[in-house]
Amino acid sequence: MAEKDKYRPLANFPSTAWGCSFASFSSSNSDFELYTREVETLKEKVRPMVTASTKDPLENVQIINLLYRLGVSYHFENEITDQLNHIFEIIPNHIISDDNDYDLYTVAILFQILRQYGHKVPCDVFNKFKNSDGKFKKSIANDLKGLLSLYEASFLSVHGENILDEAIAFTRPLLESFADQSSPHLAKYIRNSLLRPHHQGIQRVEARQYISFYEEDESRNETLLKFAKLDFNRLQLLHKQELASLSRYKKYIAQIIIWEDLNLAKELPYIRDRLVETYLWAIGAHFEPQYALSRAIIAKYTTIVSAVDDTYDAYGTLDELQRFTNAFQRCDIDAIDELPDYMKVLYRALLNFFDQIEDEVDEGRSYSTSVAKEAFKELVRSYYVEAQWFSDGYVPSFDEYMRNGLITSTYTVLPAASFIGMENTVGEKEYKWVQSNPKIVKAAKIICRLMDDITTHEDEQKRGHCASSIECYMKEYGVSEKKAIEEIQKICANAWKDMNEECMKKPPTVSRTLLKYYVNLARVIDFVYKNLDSYTYASSLKGDITTVFLELLPV
């Protein structure tokens, strides 16, 4: 065996920031039921606010915006859809006309909420805030509320909407200046928005931040605030129960999936032990109670996929990786004898995962586990391609790298498995749609692959790794690292526009729930990989995990 085939690119990843913190958590069903009763009581008080007919549709939109930002709009999806369908019929032409007296904040909120729910309000609505020379009017430069709303709304742009790109460039420096001069409370809110606009943030994290901000608003609606707090605490309790169950590797709380005792971190000390972070990934995909099974699948499967990724990237020799790749193409327990002992743990975990899922799927849905298995076979083949590239010192073209990299993004394998827990949303038609690699699915993979590369490539190159998209771009186009990153960030921005475009397509190809799922996957990546590899250096997520999973809101 050649010496290069025996090389181990050890990473020495940081240990878990949580240990067994969540395993000891326990609560009775009565706690959750008590919260649920209180939430249901307040929900009936809030419902008339959503369904009320008003002379000015702005009042309805402002309530919907509040519900959305406070994280409770999921309770009223049908009512909100009906309201916005009606508003969209009457609003666009009115707000485009020059004779309306809507200010910047009003226009931006109408634009943002309608687009958020799939209605493509034309970007021309912002022309009234420009001078004849095409520049934004100086008169709006002191309107903090309007500037923030314009900034947030601009991230719902699609291709060709230059005015929204200009709006981001116009508002950002002004908002940075406001942040420097504002009270600590307001400055924090502005800086959170500048770091990550609401449209690109994880919904639970965004809701927690906004509840704290709204609590300081003198014009706050006390009923809405209490409703949001109680519902946040209710969901936190549910999520904490799920996480505790996962942490103990015992029977899943809904008694649907049973996991054997399997401590991957103990058996495979070189991997990143990130169960808590993978569960954050799961609630980022969907936090609502009805998706408990899908969350369990995402968290457990991501833990296993992460261990396989670390094996290919940071431990396995080329010979061992080839054996593992070949073994999983058979997907048979008999192939385990061909593997070194440490790989047998991973291989057995994978087969157990698929066996347990297969036992639980409803009759007529066996195709779902077949799709998940085939996706994983493709993933390990692509992981092995990267290992070969590194071993051979080969730097592919950017396009060749991306063809393989969209697969190693894991945004094919993770949805394929998590859909098993979404049977009311994802059927055979939806699986076929996903396999056709539509624009929104490809965009989520692009964002995942490239944002990951931007923050991880330096560490990976130091320890030994195949060229990332950054190195491939630098070599192909003869540019600096800084320039390559700038161009790749533009590709990510365009991918977001692709996602927005797909979400506003009429009629929609698939349900809004499924479209939102892919937007949420992109949001998770932005949260985890913006400016830092927070999956590897997970202590950076500790504050957000604490507020989302551990700290109850005082009511």
Curated annotation (Swiss-Prot):
One MF annotation (Gene Ontology) recorded for this entry: terpene synthase activity
Binding residues annotated for Mg(2+) 1, in chain numbering: 309, 313
Signal peptide annotation: none
Ligand binding (Mg(2+) 2): 309, 313
Domain of life: Eukaryota
Stretches assigned to coiled coil: none
Example of a GO biological process term: diterpenoid biosynthetic process
EC number: 4.2.3.-
Keyword Magnesium: yes
Cofactor note: Binds 3 Mg(2+) ions per subunit.
Binding sites annotated in the UniProt record for Mg(2+) 3: 460
Named cofactor requirement(s): Mg(2+)
Major enzyme class: lyase
Record-linked PANTHER family: OS04G0344100 PROTEIN-RELATED, TERPENE SYNTHASE 6-RELATED
More info: Does not produce any detectable product when tested in vitro.
Protein family (similarity comment): Belongs to the terpene synthase family.
Job of this protein: Probable sesquiterpene synthase.
Name this polypeptide is given: Probable terpene synthase 6
Organism name: Ricinus communis
Gene: TPS6
